[in-house]
Regions:
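Active-site- and interface-proximal helix/loop "cap" or "latch" segments in soluble metabolic
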Residues: 1-71
Length: 71
């Protein structure tokens, strides 16, 4: 899965797109998190699992957001 995410100088998410994963669910996630603060999204989505997998698309988005904050 590839995640492209951008945020402004106030850590407000401006754009998110995923390559791979469940298209409908990911479109919903993108719309819900756009305009939200990075830390708020991480607090809500970190640690979500997908079935027996240790991670999920929302959890992977959190990892991408954490990397973005480090830039």
């Amino acid at each position: 899965m590839l995640i492209d995410v951008t945020a402004d100088d106030n850590d407000i998410i401006q754009q998110v797109s995923f390559l791979g994963g469940c298209d409908g669910n990911l479109q919903g996630i993108c719309r819900l998190v756009t305009g939200q603060k990075i830390d708020d999204v991480i607090a809500k989505l970190r640690g979500i699992r997908c079935g027996d997998k240790p991670t999920s698309c929302p959890d992977q988005l959190c990892h991408a957001l954490e990397q973005l904050k480090e830039l």
